[in-house]
C-alpha cells in the first residue's frame, strides 16, 4: 500500500513539477522563518537575561530612605541611614536570607606610574562575587574573609579599567595607588555582558574589602545592602521582614515604603522572562503565518490533483477501492509534501544557525555580544514539526475528503 502511495505521489510531482517546486519552496521558506525566528529570539532572550543577571543575580538592593509616616510620636521626613552592622543584624534575624553584603561606594583615583584614572570603587564582602557575578579570571581571585578581617589593602578590578591602567601587563600582584594609598591587585574580573547598569558597568569597577574601605575613608553609613533570599519566590516575605527588623531599630512604621528603597532584581527577572515569552510568541506567530501561506499552496496543489484524477478515482472506486484508501492517499501526499519542504527548511536553518554560532563574540563585534547566539532547541524543533504536521494534515484532509466523496458513476464520465 505504502509503495503505491509513494509511486502515485512522485507521479503527481512529475505531472505538476513547477507547481510542486513552488509549493516546496514556500514550505521550506516558511519552515526557515519559524525556526530562525524562534532560534534567534531564544538566543536574544537568553543573552538579555544573562546580561541582567550579571548586574544582580537574584538579589535585592536595600537603600536608606526618608520616613513618609509618623511613628511612635516621631515626625515623618526623618532620614534612615544604615550601617554595616545592619547586615549582620538582618542575617541573624531573617533565616530566609542566604547572602548579604554591606556596600560602600565612591569615586576614586587609581594611579600606576604616570597613568591615573578615576572610576567607581565599592567596599563589599566576599558574597558580592556571586551576587554580582564578578568572577575572577585565571591566576586571580576575588576578596576573601581574611581580606575583610585583616583590612587588607587589596583590590579587584574590572577588565576594562585594568587594561586602561596596565595595558598588556598582567595586573595580578601589581601595586597601584588608590587615592595615594598603595593597594595590591589580587584579581581581574572575567569579561561579561551587562544590560542593567548598577551604578555603572562592572568592567570599569574597582572593589575592595568593606572594612578597608571604611578605614581608608572613614565612612559611617553604608550606601546600600545587597540581599539574596535563599528562595527567590519568597522575596516579598523577605522584604517585609527587612522593613520589620530595620523599622524596629530605626523606629519607623514597617508599612512605610518610603523609609527604605529596594531595587528588586528578582522581580525584574520575572518581568523580563514574561517579556521574553511575549516576544517568542510574537516571533512564532510571524513565522506561523508564513508557514500557513505555504499550507494554502499545498491545499491548492492537492485540489488540482484531485480534479485532474477524478476519472482515475472513479475507476479505483468502481473496482472496489474503499473511501478510506482514497482519503489516506491524498492525506499522505500532502503530509509527504510538507515533510520534504520541512526537512529542507530544517537543514537550511541548521546550517545558518551553525554558521552564526561560529562567529566569535570578540570585543569588536558588539552586536553579537548583545544578540547572543541562536539556540536550536528541542522545543523549537518539536513545535515546528508539530505545525508542519498540522498544516500538512489540514491541507490534505479537505481535498482528500472531496476525492473520497465523489460518485464513481459520475467520475467515470469525467474527462
Protein language model features and the residues they cover:
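Transmembrane alpha-helical interface segments in multi-pass membrane proteins
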Residues: 3-10, 14, 18-26, 33, ...
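Alpha-helical membrane-interface segments at transmembrane helix boundaries
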Residues: 10, 14, 42-45, 49, ...
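Generic structural signal for small/hydrophobic residues in well-ordered secondary structure
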Residues: 16, 44, 62, 90, ...
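Short juxtamembrane loops and helix-capping segments at transmembrane helix boundaries
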Residues: 55, 350-382
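Short cytosolic juxtamembrane segments of multi-pass membrane proteins
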Residues: 3-4, 400-415
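Mid-to-C-terminal secondary-structure elements
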Residues: 126-143, 152-253
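Hydrophobic, regular-secondary-structure patches
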Residues: 42-120, 127-131, 145-146, 163-164, ...
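Peri-transmembrane interface segments
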Residues: 226, 239-242, 253-287
Amino acid at each position: 500500500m505504502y509503495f503505491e502511495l509513494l509511486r502515485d505521489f512522485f507521479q503527481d510531482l512529475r505531472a505538476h513539477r513547477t507547481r510542486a517546486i513552488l509549493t516546496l519552496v514556500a514550505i521550506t521558506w516558511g519552515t526557515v522563518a519559524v525556526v530562525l525566528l524562534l532560534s534567534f529570539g531564544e538566543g536574544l532572550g537568553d543573552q538579555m537575561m544573562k546580561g541582567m543577571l550579571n548586574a544582580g543575580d537574584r538579589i535585592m538592593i536595600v537603600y536608606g530612605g526618608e520616613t513618609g509616616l509618623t511613628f511612635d510620636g516621631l515626625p515623618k521626613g526623618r532620614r534612615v541611614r544604615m550601617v554595616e552592622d545592619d547586615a549582620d543584624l538582618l542575617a541573624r534575624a531573617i533565616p530566609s536570607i542566604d547572602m548579604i553584603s554591606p556596600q560602600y561606594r565612591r569615586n576614586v583615583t587609581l594611579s600606576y606610574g604616570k597613568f591615573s584614572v578615576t572610576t567607581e570603587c565599592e567596599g563589599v564582602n566576599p558574597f558580592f562575587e556571586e551576587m554580582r557575578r564578578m568572577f575572577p579570571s585565571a591566576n586571580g581571585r576575588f576578596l576573601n574573609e581574611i581580606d575583610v578581617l585583616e583590612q587588607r589593602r587589596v583590590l579587584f578590578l574590572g577588565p576594562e579599567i585594568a587594561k586602561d591602567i596596565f595595558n598588556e601587563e598582567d595586573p595580578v600582584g601589581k601595586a597601584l595607588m588608590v587615592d595615594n594609598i598603595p593597594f595590591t591587585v589580587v584579581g581581574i574580573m572575567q569579561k561579561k555582558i551587562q544590560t542593567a547598569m548598577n551604578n555603572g558597568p562592572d568592567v570599569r569597577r574597582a572593589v575592595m574589602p568593606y572594612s578597608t574601605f571604611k578605614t581608608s575613608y572613614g565612612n559611617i553609613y553604608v550606601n546600600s545592602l545587597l540581599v539574596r533570599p535563599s528562595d527567590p519566590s519568597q522575596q516579598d516575605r523577605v522584604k517585609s521582614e527587612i522593613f520589620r527588623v530595620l523599622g524596629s531599630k530605626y523606629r519607623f512604621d514597617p508599612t512605610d515604603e518610603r523609609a527604605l528603597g529596594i531595587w528588586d532584581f528578582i522581580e525584574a527577572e520575572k518581568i523580563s522572562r514574561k517579556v521574553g515569552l511575549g516576544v517568542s510568541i510574537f516571533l512564532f506567530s510571524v513565522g506561523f503565518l508564513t508557514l500557513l501561506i505555504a499550507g494554502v499552496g499545498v491545499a491548492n496543489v492537492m485540489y488540482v490533483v484531485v480534479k485532474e484524477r477524478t476519472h482515475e478515482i472513479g475507476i479505483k472506486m468502481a473496482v472496489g477501492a474503499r473511501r478510506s484508501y482514497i482519503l489516506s492517499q491524498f492525506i499522505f501526499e500532502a503530509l509527504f509534501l510538507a515533510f520534504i519542504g520541512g526537512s529542507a527548511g530544517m537543514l537550511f536553518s541548521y546550517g545558518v544557525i551553525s554558521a552564526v554560532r561560529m562567529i566569535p563574540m570578540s570585543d569588536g563585534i558588539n552586536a553579537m555580544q548583545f544578540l547572543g547566539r541562536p539556540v536550536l532547541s528541542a522545543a523549537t524543533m518539536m513545535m515546528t514539526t508539530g505545525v508542519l504536521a498540522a498544516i500538512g494534515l489540514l491541507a490534505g484532509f479537505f481535498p482528500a475528503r472531496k476525492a473520497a466523496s465523489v460518485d464513481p458513476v459520475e467520475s467515470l464520465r469525467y474527462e
